[in-house]
């Protein structure tokens, strides 16, 4: 499989065409961004870590029957994935009060929720990726009610798999963001990535943060935090 021309470049990844109409080549970048791109920095090794962690987690989900776009890891920073039409919604699942939810509800960060909350955010940089209701989604016409129901069900299924998997590594899954795509056959599958860029991950005992909040809040060395997650997941750490 060959990497051909650049199709799209986002904050964290570059997407390239391949000679297969059904596959695209993903390259993870060493860039870190926060606050809708207002804070930016190049962090050597971040792309490798997100690629390695996403590979491990997508393989775990595939093992239990969850359909994803992941095909294979091509290099330390690259993956081959199925080409899908991305649904322009970020699906956020929350198990513990943190981040914007703490501010929005006026509740203390770290409060454990009795059951998970699923939220939808409209993917639009100009609007700041706003929180939307299912009624808003219908008005925006970006997903049908049936698709929204599938997204919610898949997010909750993935949440339980990841909660258990991270717990075995002594990590608490606080919350995480997912993106989904539609195949040519009309099936909804998991796309994008699952990494410390898209999850809040805390040590189950100390609540030490191993995610992008380290960068957002200037809490320490980002690559050290991501290396710790990779090590606990059983990947090859470069520490």
Curated annotation (Swiss-Prot):
Q: Which HAMAP family match?
A: SAICAR_synth
* Matches recorded under NCBIfam families: purC
* Highest taxon in the source lineage: Bacteria
Where does this protein come from, organism-wise? Bacillus anthracis
Pathway membership? Purine metabolism; IMP biosynthesis via de novo pathway; 5-amino-1-(5-phospho-D-ribosyl)imidazole-4-carboxamide from 5-amino-1-(5-phospho-D-ribosyl)imidazole-4-carboxylate: step 1/2
Entry protein name:
Phosphoribosylaminoimidazole-succinocarboxamide synthase
Q: What is its EC number?
A: 6.3.2.6
GO biological process: one example: cobalamin biosynthetic process
User: From the record, what ranges are coiled-coil?
Assistant: none
Q: Which reaction does it catalyse?
A: 5-amino-1-(5-phospho-D-ribosyl)imidazole-4-carboxylate + L-aspartate + ATP = (2S)-2-[5-amino-1-(5-phospho-beta-D-ribosyl)imidazole-4-carboxamido]succinate + ADP + phosphate + 2 H(+)
Enzyme class at the top of the EC tree: ligase
For this UniProt record, give its keywords in alphabetical order, as a comma-separated list.
ATP-binding, Ligase, Nucleotide-binding, Purine biosynthesis
List the InterPro entries hit by this protein, alphabetically. Answer: SAICAR_synt/ADE2_N, SAICAR_synt_PurC, SAICAR_synth, SAICAR_synthetase, SAICAR_synthetase_CS
> Could you tell me which Pfam families the record lists for this protein?
SAICAR_synt
What family is this protein classified in? Belongs to the SAICAR synthetase family.
Looking up Gene3D superfamilies in the UniProt record yields:
ATP-grasp fold, B domain, Phosphorylase Kinase, domain 1
Any one GO MF term held by the record is: ATP binding
């Amino acid at each position: 499989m060959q990497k051909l021309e650049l199709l799209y470049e986002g904050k964290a990844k570059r997407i390239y065409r391949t000679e297969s109409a059904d596959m695209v080549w993903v390259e993870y970048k060493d860039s870190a961004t926060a606050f809708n791109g207002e804070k930016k920095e190049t962090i050597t090794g971040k792309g490798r870590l997100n690629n390695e962690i996403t590979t491990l987690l997508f393989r775990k989900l595939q093992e239990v029957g969850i359909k994803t776009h992941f095909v294979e890891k091509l290099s330390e920073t690259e993956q081959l994935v199925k080409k899908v039409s991305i649904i322009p919604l970020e699906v956020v699942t929350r198990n513990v009060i943190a981040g914007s939810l703490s501010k929005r509800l006026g509740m203390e960060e770290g409060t454990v929720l009795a059951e998970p909350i699923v939220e939808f955010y409209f993917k639009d940089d100009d609007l700041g990726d706003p929180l939307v209701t299912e009624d808003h989604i219908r008005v925006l016409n970006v997903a049908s009610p049936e698709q929204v129901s599938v997204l919610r069900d898949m997010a909750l299924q993935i949440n339980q798999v990841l909660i258990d998997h991270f717990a075995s590594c002594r990590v608490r899954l606080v919350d995480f963001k997912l993106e989904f795509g539609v195949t040519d056959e009309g099936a909804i599958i998991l796309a994008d990535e699952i990494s410390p860029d898209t999850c809040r991950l805390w040590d189950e005992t100390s609540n030490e943060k191993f995610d992008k909040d380290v960068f957002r809040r200037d809490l320490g060395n980002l690559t050290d935090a991501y290396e710790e997650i990779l090590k606990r997941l059983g990947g090859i750490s470069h520490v």
